[in-house]
Amino acid sequence: LLAHLAKLCVRSIGQPDAGLWEIRNGWQEHSFTNLMSWAGLERLERIKQAGHLGSISLDLTHARIHAAEALLRGVQGGALRNGPTDSSDDAALSQLPILGYPNRQLCESTVLRITHELSLRRGSEDTGFFYRYVRSDDFGKPEGAFVICSFWIAQALARLGRTSEARTILDRVLVAANHVGLFSEHFIPATNT
């Protein structure tokens, strides 16, 4: 099973797809797909090095490096963007430090860009909520925050040692919980809905 998953990771590197957000009319090479391929291959490489993965015909080190090279094609202006041909920002890429990508400078510049560019503000005030992206999709431009993005960004900031900023985001996002502590997918801070 793990060998099969490794082959699927390799097959996905650099290939057009609908991306994490399943954009119907936006098939392209996505940095998030390359990041997930890198993460899967990096974990499989560690599993093999620990002696818990039998014979596998794939050179996992070479495959991981190939995924990292593909990922770096999406870097523009020092931060990872949606893809090599798409300079838009994507909050899912805040998972770079969460997944342990080894380039701290790239992790930090990407997360800080996302927090700046995708923050849902009320006037000039940050609300602690973030758009998953601000580009148009099959339904137009996003109007509300995508709640999981706040948690990703808080975790990423904490991984980068920016715990005060992470806590502020978490404190602000708690208003989105319903009466039993559950969060919806979308949230509009202006109306608390």
Region spans (language model):
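Extended glycan-interaction surfaces of carbohydrate-active proteins
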Residues: 3-21, 61-147, 168-193
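Short alpha-helical patches at coil-to-helix transitions and adjacent helical residues
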Residues: 30-38, 90-93, 147-150
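Well-ordered alpha-helical scaffold segments within catalytic/enzyme domains
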Residues: 1, 36-53, 95-105, 151-165
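The feature captures the catalytic groove of carbohydrate-active enzymes
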Residues: 1-66
